[in-house]
Amino acid sequence: MLKLFSAFRKNKIWDFNGGIHPPEMKTQSNGTPLRQVPLAQRFVIPLKQHIGAEGELCVSVGDKVLRGQPLTRGRGKMLPVHAPTSGTVTAIAPHSTAHPSALAELSVIIDADGEDCWIPRDGWADYRSRRREELIERIHQFGVAGLGGAGFPTGVKLQGGGDKIETLIINAAECEPYITADDRLMQDCAAQVVEGIRILAHILQPREILIGIEDNKPQAISMLRAVLADSHDISMRVIPTKYPSGGAKQLTYILTGKQVPHGGRSSDIGVLMQNVGTAYAVKRAVIDGEPITERVVTLTGEAIARPGNVWARLGTPVRHLLNDAGFCPSADQMVIMGGPLMGFTLPWLDVPVVKITNCLLAPSANELGEPQEEQSCIRCSACADACPADLLPQQLYWFSKGQQHDKATTHNIADCIECGACAWVCPSNIPLVQYFRQEKAEIAAIRQEEKRAAEAKARFEARLARLEREKAARLERHKSAAVQPAAKDKDAIAAALARVKEKQAQATQPIVIKAGERPDNSAIIAAREARKAQARAKQAELQQTNDAATVTDPRKTAVEAAIARAKARKLEQQQANAEPEQQVDPRKAAVEAAIARAKARKLEQQQANAEPEQQVDPRKAAVEAAIARAKARKLEQQQANAEPEEPVDPRKAAVEAAITRAKARKLEQQQANAEPEEQVDPRKAAVAAAIARAKARKLEQQQANAEPEEQVDPRKAAVAAAIARVQAKKAVQQKVVNED
């Protein structure tokens, strides 16, 4: 008896509220076996054919590709796509895709070469020896996604289930009218489907495995039973035909009696569901080593001459499939991708087949009937009775039209599975599903904007916090920098204060003068002299700085010196001519001549010291020196002629001659030292030196002949001349040492 009750409970099924029974229209396409379609000339492969972000491109225009070669890399939830055939990548550009609005998405366009060559395939026949993580990664990298219509990456779904999955459900209900892709796949490939189910079971290790299939598929049921005859780990449950019993939440409740909580997932109650087509794709990926490059697509409708189910390559244009099936379009012909309740009308036929394409319906005008005009809601509640999710479609309709997003969210619009049962039974012909889709899209956009605002607010608050931290750290640094001075600084400050106090005490000390004593002002006098000396030193430094800063031309300086000497001689001549009878003191004249010569020498010295680095032409300098000596001798002769009666001291004359010779030698030395690098003609230098010596001797002779009548002791004159020469040489040497 207990076994009977256990068996009864084991095979028990539950029924959900709502649902409808539309015409099935499945016999048009489920009677013929699966067949291949000739390759198209061009394939368009969108990078995003699943829920999640598109993968990273790994091919470029002009690349040769083989069938099964990855076109993108799959990282995280990004699912890769693969080449459906061999050929050449001709473009990577946006292209209209399978979407109600025909949105353009980035796609890889391949021109087929007709050879249809595969990449090297490496199958894992002994998949049981592989680790769970390896199998999940292989399924993910081979591009397997949910082929029942959702398109969720299978590898991510298996990874998220983890160890908490107790029941694995294989969805074979296929409840929507016209669609027979899963039915035909189970009839023709039942063994491969079961093998895929075993791979999923090996990964998840569930406690039970259930196959849910509607009772309107007798051939598929018989094929599965034949394959599962010797299996005791997989149970097949045949359920009554009712739309939408193929929904994930509805089928879960039918087979287990468990309800998925609002806003939750089936994994929350220990259930994971996979489609029949997904199980077949898992088998091909793991055992055969073939990425998903094709899927079964139902071609049906009265506008198609040869309806049936075909193996359609992903990326094949819809027009190519329809033309191969004998498509006979009428005026205003529509083509629906998907079923009549959950599908959408294609804006044109150049869109490609993708992973979630399970049916192409081309109905005639008789099948669809005349279009009905939308009318006002009469609140009949027929939609609420038909809703399989236990929602209130009429309330959601009003909230959607009134943009009352909060109320729509409160009434669980997110739980709507968009099955279309409410719109099917609506007597006012209101396209309720369209309103619900639009409302859910608007709510998603609002939440996305709120998320961005929250992230921006978080960034702003983080920035404010960072600025506050930086400000606090800056203030702390200022406080630490404003601490008391160090010990040595304190000592220096104390010493300065002591000196100031001492000076103030000395300044305020009264001066006491005792009777009979003179005040001692020596300190004051010494301080005054020190200040004067300091002022003179500063003045001298300033004068030296100004002299050093003044850059003059040596030739101009020589000219100025010559002009000064000429003016001195002219003044002496004027004085001599103006008063010939006037007795001139010879000593004063000699003093004035000496002063003039001293000024000339000083000017020459300043010229030599002003620019020692300046490059001077030695020949020009020699000429100027000779001119200066000649002018000096001429001035002496004029002085001698102006006062013939004046007796001349021979010793003075000898001294002057020696000084003149010394000047000549010094000038020659300065010229030689000024440019040691300059190449000078030795013959010219010797000639110039000889001329200078000859002029000096001539001057001595003139001085000697000026007063022949004067009796001069020759011995005294010789001694005086020798002494003068020695003194002149000594003076020149001392001057050279000082200048060095």
Swiss-Prot record:
Alphabetically, the GO molecular function entries are: 4 iron, 4 sulfur cluster binding; electron transfer activity; metal ion binding
**Positions annotated to bind [4Fe-4S] cluster 2:** 387, 416, 419, 422
Swiss-Prot/TrEMBL keywords: 4Fe-4S, Cell inner membrane, Cell membrane, Electron transport, Iron, Iron-sulfur, Membrane, Metal-binding, Repeat, Translocase, Transport
Any idea where this protein resides? Answer: Cell inner membrane
What SUPFAM superfamilies does this protein's entry cite?
A: alpha-helical ferredoxin, Nqo1 FMN-binding domain-like
* Needed cofactors: [4Fe-4S] cluster
Tell me the domain of life: Bacteria
Q: Which Pfam families match?
A: Complex1_51K, Fer4_7, RnfC_N, SLBB
For the biological process aspect of GO, one term held by this record is:
electron transport chain
- Cite the residue spans of the region called Disordered: 602-652, 664-685, 695-714
What is known about its subunit structure?
Answer: The complex is composed of six subunits: RsxA, RsxB, RsxC, RsxD, RsxE and RsxG.
Please report the name of this protein according to its UniProt entry.
Answer: Ion-translocating oxidoreductase complex subunit C
Q: Which organism is it from?
A: Escherichia coli O157:H7
